[in-house]
Amino acid sequence: MSGVSRRDVLRAAGVAAAGAGANAAAAGPAGEIRVIASGNGLEATRRGYQLIAEGQDPLDAVVAGVAIVEDDPLDTSVGYGGLPNERGVVELDAAVMHGPSHKAGAVAALQNIRHPAQVALRVLRRTDHVLLVGAGALEFARAHGFHEENLLTENARQIWLQWKERLSSEDDWLPEPEPANAAVEAFFRKNSTVVGDTGRLRFRRPTGTIHCSAINAASDMSCTTTTSGMAFKIPGRVGDSPIIGAGLYVDNTVGSCGSTGRGEANLQNLSSFAAVELMRQGASPEEAGMEILRRIAKTTEPRLRDREGRPDFGINFYIMAKDGRYAGVTMHGEATFAVTDSKGSRLEKCRALYP
């Protein structure tokens, strides 16, 4: 994959030089390579780190890293194998943002293309736009040689079908009399409860996604977020992942932030942009993340709160500052995020607003 165009590099260099006196953070000393990601992105961070160490642009590196997860049929929240919309059709969203040029690209409701982050990268490099959606995004992907395929794996199809069969006792769909395969049963045990003795389910729709941010030795930053979105969503629903300022944001003079979890809560607060702005004002990555979680908790509508008044959904943020400091935060419970740097690759714990 080629680097960012020479024109963009020259433009970014000119902007950086012009603003050096106005923002001392832009002219900090060279640091170390670091790549962070959501908990499902450990291999993505390893791959990204390796490519940056070999001299690739951080944006190319993170897009190549998340492709590992987009290819994984066992990750039901991203790419090939992602859970479909309510009609059984897989729709993917992704965005990329390049720190040095401050350019971004995104696609939403994209069908039949397993690497939406790569398509988003083409939007950044080969168009004057930021976001393409639906049929237009697919036409653009075809024009750039991306291969179309059915993204609905057998595992995802069985999960979708069981969801549809168990959704209501008032329709004509009946659950199969024999238990599903072990993987499907495990999925439903984790994400649902049985209502009475009806066999019907009260289902908590999982919201996965992968976010990945990177910084190189020159302290240039980039990031990407890619997802299959909320499971069994209304066709055409778009979450936070492809929205710049929500699913991800980077300011090369300050830092980056990205999110996984309930996209609607993020969209209503433009959380990634807000987190970076808090860092601009002096907050650490963890302080910025915790403040964003508090804002989301404060604005959550009553139907989405538990008996104690707390948000009953999950949402996580992965934040990195220009100086290399980083943090992962989560609304509640336990969550991890992936890190690869000179100390190696590892999962670290996110700090929870509600432990």
Name these PLM-found stretches:
Residues 1-17:
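N-terminal secretory signal peptides and thylakoid transit peptides that target proteins
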Residues 338-340:
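Broad, structure-driven detector of short, well-ordered beta-strand segments within folded domains
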Residues 20-30:
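Bacterial Sec-dependent signal peptides at the C-terminal "C-region" and cleavage site
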